[in-house]
Amino acid sequence: MVPRGFFITFEGGEGAGKSTQIHLLADRLRREGRDVLTTREPGGSPGAEAIRHVLLSGAAEPFGATLEAILFAAARSDHVEQVIRPAVESGAIVLCDRFLDSSRVYQGVTGGLASDFMAALERVTVNGLIPDLTVILDIDPEEGLRRASERRGKATADRFEKENLEIHRRRREAFLNIAAREPQRCVVIDASRSADAVSENVTEIVLRVIFDRAGLSEPTEAGSV
């Protein structure tokens, strides 16, 4: 029987550096000979990517927050069953840019949807697949939006980046509240530092999770597990 892999999600506000950190971590793990899959939400599977365009373009906004949350849930369900679950069951390390915590924050806290409704959607869409580790990259929203704008260049900002600063501040607080409620799953990392400094911190934490699963007290040599 193939040992179960790891499911690691990255969360945080706009411009926190999630995609950058996933790329750096994936490179490090692959150099150690590990099987790594990188993916994102909304998206990650053909069906979910089609829904992603509708969601990020703002085309779903006229239909209201409830239908929009259902679209996010549909994308996640397809992503989980077509991509994430098979990869984890095959022994891969899956690194995902956003997952259930983003729905809790964006559609729940700042979208105004009831927590019991969001919890019901979550149960159906993830079907028991909860991340082994969630890395929350924490950054001041003003700095995050500045970085996002710099990264984007002349491209059009997506609908979430266009929202007012107070909403971004509420989202930051909501992510930190999730981390406080679920310390066994979540770790908060200061993302205001350089990408290399953040990457070093992320790698140390992820390797600790891997070594703990293997029953070793401390990493002794890269790639030895």
Swiss-Prot record:
Its EC number is 2.7.4.9. ATP binds at G12, G13, E14, G15, A16, G17, K18, S19. Keywords: ATP-binding, Kinase, Nucleotide biosynthesis, Nucleotide-binding, Transferase. One of its GO terms (cellular component) is cytosol. It is an enzyme of class 2 (transferase). The keyword Iron-sulfur does not apply. Belongs to the thymidylate kinase family. HAMAP family: Thymidylate_kinase. This is Thymidylate kinase. It comes from Chelativorans sp. (strain BNC1).
